[in-house]
Amino acid sequence: MARSATSDARKKDTREKIELGGLIVKAGLRYEKRVLLLGALVDLSRRLNSDESERARLIAIGAEAFGDDGE
């Protein structure tokens, strides 16, 4: 039973990582260096923690980018 739960958790984790990678591709950043992407995400995290209007602005941009296929 524990093995099955571990396997399910790993599958879920893998699926989530694949989906997050898809966001990088959708944003047109597939060929950027990983250090740049990580730096951008760290900076974004800091900005989101300190500025709620930035969060709202980026949600609007993301919703537009997803169009009808978004979340």
Curated annotation (Swiss-Prot):
It comes from the Bacteria. Keywords: Conjugation, Plasmid. InterPro entries: Conjugal_tfr_TraD_a-type. Belongs to the TraD family. NCBIfam families: PRK13847.1. This is Probable conjugal transfer protein TraD. It comes from Sinorhizobium fredii (strain NBRC 101917 / NGR234).
